[in-house]
Amino acid sequence: MIVLDDQTCPVGMIGNLMKFFAHESCGFCTPCRDGLPWVDSIFRDFEAGRGSEKDLNILKEQVDYMGPGRTFCALAPGATAPLGSGLKYFEDDFKEHIKQKRCTYKN
């Protein structure tokens, strides 16, 4: 469990986790080798104000694509837990990034 205060952007926090998971991938299986860097790049787009509804849908698809039973190890499925939870509980924050074309937690 990760606890955030009201000054911390959940999109940015989840993006930081995805960057970590993408960096730690050994590249053996396709979901890790291709999926995690793709997810990381989408989060960088959100942070830069270039996120879109299409990107949001791709992130949702990646939760299933990288989930348990689809990879050699537990790295990508481990990444889907915070990604899936973040999309479920903070979808409005993602949509606000899209609408405002920026992170609303930063001044």
Each predicted region: which residue ranges?
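Redox cofactor-anchoring modules in respiratory/redox and cofactor-processing assemblies
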Residues: 1-107
